[in-house]
């Protein structure tokens, strides 16, 4: 499929579902906003799914894609043999790690190569969440274009992508330039120590839940952030609201959630 056809399929996420999911978090028996970015991640995920009821939000099957250039073929081979730290970290959330060696010779070919790989693996593996890492020469344009194509395809198929490091953020920036609604499908895994990492996330309007002082964007941060993605969903599904717990109305009136609602109504 040509990249323009993919772009035509990308639509903004359902902000009404996002707000209703956040409303559920606000109604849980806990301090308002106390789960911070866990709430934001899950509410944004609900918007992607177009669902907001707890029984409809499930843990997505996931993979972590590590993108490589020809100069890093040895690292790609080690990843596929399970001899790289990211493989062990990803296993904690049952995430499979795939290494992709970008072979495209120009930008258009790279965009379509990335899009094709993403489509193939979403269909083959039933993926609902994909993390990105990158092992390539700094700012390799063809690798960045391949990742951008993959992000576009994921957004067209309503699958969120979690970013790791400068190269993946540059890919997201490129994808957003082609289709602004793509940003709705992008999540930040962590802030790496790479130069410009924090500024790129700010430019994209994304906030990362982790700052692990990891010096690169090879995927380790995303592998750890996958556990937080699960934690947000678990809280959303398993914690109870005042109503679900059968808390008396007179007690509910003193909850922080209700007090904030009263303040907003003034």
Predicted features by range, described:
Residues 1-266:
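N-terminal loops that bind phosphate or other acidic moieties
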């Amino acid at each position: 499929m040509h990249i323009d056809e993919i772009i035509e399929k990308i639509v903004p996420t359902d902000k009404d579902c996002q707000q209703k999911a956040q409303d559920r978090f606000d109604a849980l028996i806990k301090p308002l906003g106390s789960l911070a970015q866990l709430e934001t991640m899950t509410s944004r995920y609900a918007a992607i799914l177009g669902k907001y009821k707890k029984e409809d939000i499930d843990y997505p099957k996931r993979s972590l894609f590590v993108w490589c250039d020809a100069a890093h073929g040895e690292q790609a081979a080690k990843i596929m043999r399970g001899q790289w730290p990211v493989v062990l970290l990803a296993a904690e959330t049952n995430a499979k790690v795939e290494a992709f060696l970008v072979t495209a010779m120009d930008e258009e070919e790279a965009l379509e190569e990335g899009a094709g790989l993403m489509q193939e693996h979403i269909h083959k593996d039933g993926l609902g969440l994909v993390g990105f890492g990158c092992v390539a020469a700094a700012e390799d344009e063809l690798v960045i274009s391949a990742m951008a194509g993959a992000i576009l395809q994921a957004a067209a198929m309503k699958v969120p992508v979690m970013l790791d490091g400068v190269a993946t953020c540059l890919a997201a920036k490129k994808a957003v330039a082609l289709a602004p609604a793509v940003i709705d499908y992008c999540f930040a895994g962590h802030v790496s120590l790479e130069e410009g990492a924090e500024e790129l996330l700010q430019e994209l309007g994304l906030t990362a839940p982790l700052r692990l002082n990891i010096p690169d964007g090879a995927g380790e941060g995303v592998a750890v952030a996958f556990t937080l993605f699960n934690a947000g969903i678990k809280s959303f599904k398993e914690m109870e609201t005042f109503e679900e717990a059968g808390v008396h109305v007179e007690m509910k009136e003193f909850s922080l959630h209700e007090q904030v609602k009263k303040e907003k109504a003034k």
